[in-house]
Design a protein with these regions (language model features):
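Extracytoplasmic thiol/disulfide redox context detector
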Residues: 11-90, 94, 149, 153-171
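Divalent metal-coordination and catalytic microenvironments
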Residues: 5, 50, 114, 144
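Hydrophobic packing within well-folded, soluble alpha/beta domains
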Residues: 58-61, 101, 144, 175
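C-terminal cap of thioredoxin/glutaredoxin-like
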Residues: 53, 69-70, 131-192
Length: 192
């Protein structure tokens, strides 16, 4: 009887898998959330997860920070917000440098102190500016400088960007809600 039940269950799931249309490339988040890797605000076990692929030099990403703050205020502990890098170097020549700087700050627990500074002053992302923001964010500058040039930091930014490319993303900001790509406006009303 248990063998028959197993066989029927297996057949049912195989048939429904074949009847279900596959999720198109770019509509599903390919890398699961990794608390030890990702930049996260909110409880790890929150029922809602909002992942943003963004670029510190992108004016739309800068404007979206206000929307994200409103969404976080609306959902409170029900929401986990995750930032991932997608520097669009073709149009934002300082974006990768800014992403690397945020990763160097993150190694000191200062990602969410550094990111708002770079968004606020995104027209000023030359190295002397970035070091000033790191200082304002409370980073140890000698360690920041060392980490900034480390392979670990560069690989972290490249990993996010490669994930974005595999998902066929082409613009920032791009949001995923509970693992599925958000289509539509990225203002707070559209995300709520």
């Amino acid at each position: 009887a248990s063998v028959i039940a197993f066989a029927l269950g297996w057949a049912f799931f195989r048939i429904t898998d074949r009847l279900s249309p596959p999720v198109a490339v770019g509509l599903k988040l390919i890398r699961p959330i990794e608390p030890e890797r990702d930049h996260i605000r909110g409880p790890a076990d929150a029922p809602l997860t909002l992942v943003e692929y963004g670029d510190f030099e992108c004016p739309f990403c800068s404007r979206a920070t206000g929307s994200i703050d409103e969404v976080r205020a609306h959902f409170g502990d029900e929401l986990r917000y995750v930032w991932r890098h997608f520097p669009l170097e073709r149009v934002h020549p300082r974006a990768t440098d800014a992403a690397r700087a945020s990763e160097a700050a993150a190694l000191q627990g200062k990602f969410f102190d550094m990111a708002p500074l770079m968004f606020r002053f995104q027209d000023h992302l030359e190295w002397q500016d970035i070091y000033r923001y790191a200082d304002q964010a409370g980073c140890d500058i000698a360690r920041f400088d060392e980490d900034l040039h480390s392979p670990r930091v560069l690989h972290r930014v490249e990993d996010d960007a490669q994930d974005a490319e595999v998902m066929d993303l082409n613009a920032t900001p791009t949001f995923f809600v509970n693992g599925l790509r958000h289509k539509g406006p990225w203002d707070s009303a559209g995300l709520i």
